[in-house]
């Protein structure tokens, strides 16, 4: 099974009720589009991807409650509890300048303007005003890099290389 053109948009964390709805914890900025009626998704299983189509969805307590077409009761969907949900690559929305998908940033190398290696992005935190990239540094505590123009100077998605201006106190 290759995941090359598939992008994770959430995880089925539980079932909801007896009619076959699932609770999905979304990890996408486009959750309303990803889980709208008619959306084509893929459930990852040990045997490969299982295609599903959204019949209905709604936001409930920061989780998406989703019912897939053809599912009429909990027994048909319970086996997918804890499985990840993906969208096929061609279904991704086009982003504007200075906007990136998580998988384009995660595992990117971070260097200073002078080329000094700082670490590798391991996580992205959504804080409200701007995202914060968690950078794993060898032998040091993680660095928190705000995704703002004053700090992030360039993002080379193809080479997974991010150049930042190390402002005073940023890496302390």
UniProtKB/Swiss-Prot annotation:
Record has Repeat as a keyword = no
Domain PRC barrel, by residue range, is 97-170
What GO cellular component entries does it have? Answer: cytoplasm; ribosome
- Classification via InterPro entries: PRC-brl_dom (IPR027275), PRC_barrel-like_sf (IPR011033), RimM (IPR011961), RimM_N (IPR002676), RimM_N_sf (IPR036976), Transl_B-barrel_sf (IPR009000)
User: Recorded GO terms, molecular function?
Assistant: ribosome binding
Question: Any idea where this protein resides?
Answer: Cytoplasm
| GO biological process terms on file | ribosomal small subunit biogenesis; rRNA processing
Keywords, A to Z, come to:
Chaperone, Cytoplasm, Ribosome biogenesis, rRNA processing
Which family does the record assign?
Answer: Belongs to the RimM family.
Spell out the subunit comment: Binds ribosomal protein uS19.
Q: What is known of its domains?
A: The PRC barrel domain binds ribosomal protein uS19.
Q: What does this protein do?
A: An accessory protein needed during the final step in the assembly of 30S ribosomal subunit, possibly for assembly of the head region. Essential for efficient processing of 16S rRNA. May be needed both before and after RbfA during the maturation of 16S rRNA. It has affinity for free ribosomal 30S subunits but not for 70S ribosomes.
Protein name according to UniProt = Ribosome maturation factor RimM
Species per Swiss-Prot/TrEMBL record: Leuconostoc citreum (strain KM20)
Q: What is the lineage of its organism?
A: Bacteria, Bacillati, Bacillota, Bacilli, Lactobacillales
Gene name, Swiss-Prot/TrEMBL: rimM
């Amino acid at each position: 099974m290759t995941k090359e053109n598939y992008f994770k948009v959430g995880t089925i964390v539980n079932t909801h009720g007896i009619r076959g709805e699932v609770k999905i914890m979304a990890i996408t900025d486009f959750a309303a589009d990803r889980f709208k009626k008619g959306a084509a998704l893929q459930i990852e299983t040990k045997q490969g991807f299982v295609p599903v189509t959204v019949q209905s969805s709604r936001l409930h307590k920061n989780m998406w409650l989703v019912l897939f077409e053809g599912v009429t009761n909990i027994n048909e969907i319970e086996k997918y509890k804890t499985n990840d949900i993906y969208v096929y690559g061609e279904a991704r929305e086009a982003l504007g300048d200075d906007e990136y998908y998580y998988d384009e940033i995660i595992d990117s190398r971070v260097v200073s303007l002078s080329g000094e290696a700082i670490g590798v992005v391991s996580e992205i935190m959504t804080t409200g005003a701007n995202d914060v990239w968690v950078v794993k540094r060898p032998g040091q505590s993680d660095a928190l890099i705000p995704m703002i123009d004053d700090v992030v100077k360039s993002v080379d998605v193809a080479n997974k290389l991010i150049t930042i201006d190390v402002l005073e106190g940023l890496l302390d």
